[in-house]
């Protein structure tokens, strides 16, 4: 007669509850936004004051018109110096990127990570019903990954 184990059956590891990890759950909703007619130097001040690298450009109805970044401001400063032109009359509308790609707020945040890698953007606006509702950044995606703790990539 063989040896019997008295330990019993091993318990199955608990699976984490399935929680959808949507872009809307990690996006930033309180945004620093800019206006199309805003002066570039005012934008530079806001970027520095708030410690951000760029932001969305909206109209009075909060509709997305474009994105302005530190890089766009740097180009303007460089061009102004090169052509010896004052920067007082230069507006966001002249330097912003107006063909803006957005991400759906209902998209899985890990699918959004793939888009960040493919497009090489630092941020994506989220628009619903033609209204800017938020923005997701690479840092927001990293926060979602921390929540998973890399133990499993299922959610």
Task: Annotate each predicted stretch with a short phrase.
Residues 1-155:
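Tandem CBS (Cystathionine beta-synthase) repeat/Bateman regulatory domains
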